[in-house]
């Protein structure tokens, strides 16, 4: 292992010890915001610290075994000990390399899921509904909670647009590779000739940003409108102007929330979504400056970037970014996304490791 990496790991362990002490300090405990921030940093460093401790212990065990080799009675046992620990060192070093990949600070956050029908008319709206159901099923399997903020239903089912908040541990980190254009090839229910049609939907995944700590928005830059929510009616139909639309005038960004009966709650939720939209746009602009220097699996986040095809006649799903094809479309549409998401994360880790090796001179 390189000396520079050893030094960095020692520094991280020192920081972990420092954080442990800080989190026991009464002054820190009384400051909720600071306590949460330090707790998250402590949690991020815990696994690295534990694995680095195991690595150093394995090195010490090898040194001890090397000294035992001089005794004929213990030579064979010492050789076995040395070989076993060398294998362990390789495994632990691989773990450390992955753990040292820079983490997106938003990975542990909740996320906003936005699905919009693209080309394909009614069929695109129906497929938007299918994608929403797919993500909802996956969220349920993970113990996450989905809260719809606004929806615009299609005339024949599904959604022209649906925006929701997905709450749970590590939601953004798990779903962030889903942004892009999703294409479907199938025979629509409305197709009398049995011809396969191609439609598309766009998906955007945005990390939820803490409204209180990260962003300052001038109230003068906002136009806030209230209106009566549209929908299919029924027991939850809005009889008052409780739906809220907020426009950020400098950027033209528009958000809305219509699901709560309380105008105050709708405004708060719309404001939280606006903050996340603005921060995401700012981050995308900053990333664009360095995007030409590296291949990034997350891509530009451009909704026109086609990332996946769902082919119903062949029962397959293909992710074009990593050339992965899975012939279990029915299971995927029922929310079985584990194999797909794991594959995307492995590819991302491989990209990041290659980039780190390049930055460290090979």
UniProtKB/Swiss-Prot annotation:
SUPFAM superfamilies from the UniProt entry: Release factor
Pfam families for the chain: PCRF (PF03462), RF-1 (PF00472)
Keywords recorded for this protein, A-Z: Cytoplasm, Methylation, Protein biosynthesis
SMART domains: PCRF (SM00937)
Highest taxon listed in the record's lineage: Bacteria
InterPro entries xref list: PCRF, Pep_chain_release_fac_I, Pep_chain_release_fac_I_sf, Prokaryotic/Mito_RF, RF-1
GO (cellular component) term, any one: cytoplasm
A molecular-function term among this protein's GO annotations: translation release factor activity, codon specific
Post-translational modification: Methylated by PrmC. Methylation increases the termination efficiency of RF1.
Residue(s) carrying N5-methylglutamine: 235
Family annotation (Gene3D superfamilies): 3.30.160.20, 3.30.70.1660, 6.10.140.1950
Location of this chain's protein in the cell: Cytoplasm
PANTHER family cross-referenced by the UniProt entry: LD18447P
Family, similarity comment: Belongs to the prokaryotic/mitochondrial release factor family.
Known role: Peptide chain release factor 1 directs the termination of translation in response to the peptide chain termination codons UAG and UAA.
Protein's recorded name: Peptide chain release factor 1
The organism of origin for this protein: Acinetobacter baumannii (strain AYE)
């Amino acid at each position: 292992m390189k000396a520079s990496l050893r030094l960095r790991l020692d520094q991280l362990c020192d920081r972990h010890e420092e954080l442990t002490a800080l989190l026991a300090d009464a002054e820190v405990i009384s400051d909720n915001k600071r306590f949460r921030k330090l707790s998250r940093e402590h949690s991020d460093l815990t696994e690295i610290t534990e694995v680095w401790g195991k690595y150093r212990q394995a090195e010490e065990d090898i040194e001890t075994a090397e000294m035992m080799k001089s005794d004929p009675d213990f030579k064979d046992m010492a050789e076995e000990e040395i070989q076993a620990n060398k294998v362990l060192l390789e495994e632990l070093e691989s773990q450390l390399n992955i753990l040292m990949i820079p983490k997106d600070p938003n990975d542990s956050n909740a996320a906003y899921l936005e699905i919009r029908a693209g080309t394909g008319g009614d069929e695109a709206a129906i497929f938007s509904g299918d994608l929403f159901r797919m993500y909802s099923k996956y969220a349920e399997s993970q113990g996450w909670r989905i809260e719809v903020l606004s929806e615009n239903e299609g005339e024949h089912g599904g959604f022209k647009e649906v925006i929701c908040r997905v709450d749970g541990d590590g939601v953004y980190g798990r779903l962030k590779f889903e942004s892009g254009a999703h294409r479907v090839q199938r025979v629509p229910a409305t197709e009398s000739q049995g011809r396969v049609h191609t439609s598309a939907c766009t998906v955007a995944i945005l990390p939820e940003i803490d409204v209180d700590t990260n962003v300052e928005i001038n109230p003068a830059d906002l136009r806030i409108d209230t209106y009566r929510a549209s929908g299919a009616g029924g027991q939850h139909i809005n009889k008052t102007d409780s739906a809220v639309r907020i426009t950020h005038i400098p950027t033209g960004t528009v958000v809305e929330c219509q699901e709560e009966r309380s105008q105050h709650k709708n405004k708060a939720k719309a404001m939280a979504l606006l903050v996340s939209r603005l921060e995401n746009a700012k981050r995308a602009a900053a990333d664009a400056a360095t995007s030409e220097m590296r291949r990034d699996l997350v891509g530009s986040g451009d909704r026109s970037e086609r990332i996946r095809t769902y082919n119903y006649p062949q029962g397959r799903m293909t992710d074009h970014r990593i050339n992965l094809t899975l012939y279990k479309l029915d299971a995927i549409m029922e929310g079985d996304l584990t194999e797909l998401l794991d594959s995307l994360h492995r590819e991302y880790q491989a990209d990041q490791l290659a980039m780190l090796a390049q930055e460290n001179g090979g």
